């Protein structure tokens, strides 16, 4: 069983279709990573959590501007930015423009926090102008994966969630995960083509 809402944000004058999904968690609790809730292209209303939130949260800023306050420090969030808020961390976030559209995911799992702690990433982070397009695609894909398969969607999305966390780590490593991923994918395609066609004359244009 799944609970979700999907509606056009005419009320707020937005242009996106707001997509949010909350799967009912069952046997997924045995997974190392699983999604608690996910939103794609969502108009963001003001949020204040003096006690924090029970789960880690990862966000992608798509359009508009906002600000996040953690530990008394306020950070401006602009388009093409990503930020992470750890569980039980008091925080606030709000729009500073008429509309502020975010992707968001909250998650859990036996290995989720352990992995982030091992990577030294279970703390509030903001990455500005970081090439967030690939991360947005991962959010979008995970949303439809969960929504389209009631039996195993969150199992498949578990792998996509890990990919999100890996992108988050790459942000911390070099600040340019999207560019590095594009280059890696391009090299992988060339290698695959070369191996499959090694016995044939290969033209540069074919690659």
Residue positions per predicted region:
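Amphipathic, well-ordered alpha-helical segments in soluble domains
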Residues: 34, 57-60, 134-138, 160, ...
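Ligand-binding loop in jelly-roll beta-barrel domains
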Residues: 87-111
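Generic protein-terminus/edge-of-domain signal
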Residues: 1-81, 89, 95-97, 119-126
């Amino acid at each position: 069983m799944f609970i979700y809402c999907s509606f056009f944000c005419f009320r707020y004058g937005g242009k996106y279709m707001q997509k949010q999904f909350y799967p009912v968690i069952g046997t997924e609790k045995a997974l190392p990573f699983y999604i608690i809730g996910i939103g794609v292209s969502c108009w963001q209303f003001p949020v204040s959590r003096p006690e924090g939130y029970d789960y880690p949260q990862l966000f992608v800023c798509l359009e508009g501007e906002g600000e996040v306050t953690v530990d008394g420090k306020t950070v401006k969030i602009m388009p093409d930015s990503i930020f992470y808020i750890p569980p039980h961390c008091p925080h606030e976030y709000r729009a500073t423009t008429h509309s502020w559209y975010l992707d968001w995911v909250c998650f859990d799992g036996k290995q989720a926090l352990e992995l982030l702690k091992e990577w030294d990433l279970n703390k509030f982070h903001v990455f500005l102008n970081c090439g967030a397009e690939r991360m947005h695609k991962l959010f979008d894909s995970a949303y439809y994966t969960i929504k389209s398969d009631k039996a195993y969607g969150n199992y498949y999305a578990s792998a996509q969630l890990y990919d999100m966390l890996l992108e988050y780590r790459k942000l911390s490593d070099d600040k340019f995960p999207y560019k590095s991923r594009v280059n890696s994918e391009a090299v992988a395609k060339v290698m695959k083509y070369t191996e499959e066609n090694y016995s044939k004359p290969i033209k540069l244009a074919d690659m």
